[in-house]
Regions:
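Short glycine-/acidic-enriched loop or helix-start segments at secondary-structure transitions
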Residues: 86-87, 114-116, 138-140, 185-188
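Structural motif
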Residues: 1, 79-80, 105-109, 130-133, ...
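Nucleotide phosphate-binding/pyrophosphate-handling subdomain across enzymes
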Residues: 10, 19-126
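Generic beta-sheet signal
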Residues: 74-76, 101-103, 170-180
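Short alpha-helical
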Residues: 2, 63, 83-84, 110-112, ...
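C-terminal helical cap/extension that packs against the catalytic core
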Residues: 1-3, 10-15, 74, 117-173
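Glycine/aspartate-rich loop-and-adjacent alpha/beta segment that forms the canonical ThDP
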Residues: 180-199
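Short hydrophobic/aromatic-enriched beta-strand-loop microsegments
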Residues: 101-102, 125-130, 174, 194-199
């Protein structure tokens, strides 16, 4: 981990140095660097004669759905659902845009903890909370009865919440996050094929 140096981080590019080699991933997210290095080390162990050119050719095909996946200009979807993941996500977006993101969250009903509430308060310019019909997702009643969530705009219908987020005048990053349960809703709204990859 200490040997990884991120050189450049953009919405569609992560440029990293590892030992004396340089690699580029076609997807944002600082956590991708560790995943890439793990893949590189594994492939080098299996194929002793592989070149950096061949490795880069493989990395050019890199696609990880639901991980800082760009859905539209300045709009991302990420399955981050705990304080560690949300902290990395918001830090990465701040690094790229130099401003706090606007967020839309749908949460599992076991994820409301003080650390994540603190991130909601401090790491976002604005936050919208929504829900979907699922026994595992925080429901309207749960949200309304949780005092720490009452400071945020609640929009029960996820499609309406997505529309509001998309159309809101804001020149910084916007991110939908909190669960892989909402992937099919997000993909349908942004007209992405849900079959592009498993989440």
């Amino acid at each position: 981990k200490d040997l990884i140096n991120i050189v450049e981080h953009k919405t569609n590019k992560l440029h990293l140095n590892y030992y004396d080699s340089s690699y580029i991933l076609p997807q944002a997210g600082s956590f991708q660097a560790e995943n890439a290095v793990l893949a590189i080390e594994t492939i080098k162990n299996e194929f002793k004669n592989i070149t950096n050119f061949q490795i880069q050719d493989g990395l050019d095909q890199w696609f990880w759905p639901g991980r800082m996946q760009q859905m539209a200009e300045n709009i991302f979807y990420d399955v981050a659902h705990n304080s560690s993941g949300v902290n990395i996500l918001t830090s990465d977006l701040f690094d790229i845009y130099n401003q706090k993101p606007m967020g839309l969250v749908v949460m599992k009903n076991d994820k409301i903890r003080p650390e994540i509430i603190s991130l909601f308060e401090n790491a976002f310019k604005e936050l919208i909370i929504s829900t979907i019909p699922s026994k595992d997702i925080l429901s309207k009643n749960d949200i309304k009865s949780t005092k720490s969530l009452n400071n945020y705009q609640f929009i029960e219908n996820l499609n309406d919440a997505l529309g509001l987020l998309k159309n809101k005048q804001f020149d910084g990053p916007k991110v939908i996050f909190g669960s892989h349960y909402i992937a099919k809703y997000v993909y349908k709204f942004f007209d992405f094929s849900f079959d592009k990859g498993n989440i």
